Design a protein with these regions (language model features):
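Conserved, single-site charged/polar hotspot
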Residues: 1-169
């Protein structure tokens, strides 16, 4: 949706990693750096074979970037896994270097479209370390497998870079 107030197509939500505009520009710690980067890149377009790319953004990677196929389900030749040490720096990334979430059983069951979940199992991880697939089993024995990113999105956890600590019913 185009917004004339900011001359942008951004949303102030997780879908665009929260567009901050002027609030970011006047921030004392990083505002000057942010404004400089925006100014230096104004008018630039990232292309591949002469066509604009979809440029993905994320705030924290868990130490490595992700391939588009793993994050969004479709491949892009220009996305590669690279080390991202800044995501593991407690000073730069205090909220997501390490995180813990309690997700209610009802939310997990809804994520898998099951009436209940009695067990969860991570079936595999991607090269970046994110969960590739996770399986839930209901009390009636029905098993459903989701992509790690689908599970992350449906349960509203911060990342597909997670491990299971315990399951409580």
């Amino acid at each position: 949706m185009y917004r004339s107030a900011c001359d942008c197509d951004l949303y102030g939500s997780i879908s665009d990693q929260t567009f901050l505009g002027y609030a970011k520009e006047i921030e004392k710690k990083f505002g000057v750096v942010w404004k400089d980067v925006v100014t230096r890149t104004t008018g630039l377009t990232i292309t591949q074979s002469g066509l604009p790319i979809t440029a993905y953004f994320f705030s924290s990677s868990g130490g490595k970037t992700e391939l588009a196929i793993n994050a969004w389900g479709s491949g892009r030749t220009y996305t590669q896994i690279v080390d991202d040490p800044g995501s593991l720096d407690l000073t730069l990334n205090p909220r997501f270097v390490s995180w813990s979430r309690d997700v209610p059983q009802s939310v997990i069951a809804a994520a898998f479209i099951l009436p209940d979940v009695v067990s969860l199992e991570i079936l595999g991880t991607n090269e970046s370390g994110t969960v590739a697939q996770i399986q839930a089993t209901s009390s009636s024995g029905v098993q459903v497998v989701l992509r790690g990113e689908t599970f992350r999105s449906r349960t509203k956890i911060p990342s597909a870079w997670f491990s299971l600590v315990s399951v409580q019913n």
